[in-house]
């Protein structure tokens, strides 16, 4: 099983993730796009990195907004994998 990060580790890693928040042992970000098509194009760009990492975000699409949530379900909270995927997602335009 993957090791959970400590509260201190979570706080330190969250500092370098612009736009992400930590709530209830989950990382969240909401990205807003011009329209639905751009939102879907962004979501499609998440597929390859998530598959490569073997770590998949929860995604909610509402017209031009995409809410992404990361947590390691089998570990019951945040792990390094969540922050690694968040860093990758942050680089996708």
UniProtKB/Swiss-Prot annotation:
Q: Could you tell me what reaction this enzyme catalyses?
A: (4aS,6R)-4a-hydroxy-L-erythro-5,6,7,8-tetrahydrobiopterin = (6R)-L-erythro-6,7-dihydrobiopterin + H2O
Alphabetized SUPFAM superfamilies for the sequence: PCD-like
- A single MF term (Gene Ontology): 4-alpha-hydroxytetrahydrobiopterin dehydratase activity
* HAMAP family noted in UniProt: Pterin_4_alpha
User: Can you tell me which family this protein belongs to?
Assistant: Belongs to the pterin-4-alpha-carbinolamine dehydratase family.
| Single biological process term from Gene Ontology | tetrahydrobiopterin biosynthetic process
- Output the InterPro entries linked to this UniProt entry: PCD_sf, Pterin_deHydtase
Instruction: Classify the source by domain of life.
Output: Bacteria
One Pfam family of this protein, by short name?
Pterin_4a
CDD domains the record matches: PCD_DCoH
Q: What is its EC number?
A: 4.2.1.96
**KW Lyase (keyword) present:** yes
| Record keywords | Lyase
Question: From what organism does this protein derive?
Answer: Nostoc punctiforme (strain ATCC 29133 / PCC 73102)
Q: Which Gene3D superfamilies match?
A: Transcriptional coactivator/pterin dehydratase (3.30.1360.20)
Cysteine-cysteine disulfides:
none
How is this protein named in the record?
Putative pterin-4-alpha-carbinolamine dehydratase
């Amino acid at each position: 099983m993957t090791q959970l990060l400590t509260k201190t580790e979570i706080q330190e890693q969250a500092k370098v993730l612009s736009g992400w928040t930590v709530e209830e042992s989950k990382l969240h970000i909401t990205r807003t796009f011009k329209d639905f098509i751009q939102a879907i194009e962004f979501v499609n760009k998440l597929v390859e990195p998530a598959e490569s990492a073997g770590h998949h975000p929860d995604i909610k699409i509402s017209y031009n907004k995409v809410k992404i949530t990361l947590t390691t379900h089998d570990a019951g909270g945040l792990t390094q994998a969540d922050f690694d995927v968040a860093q990758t997602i942050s680089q996708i335009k």
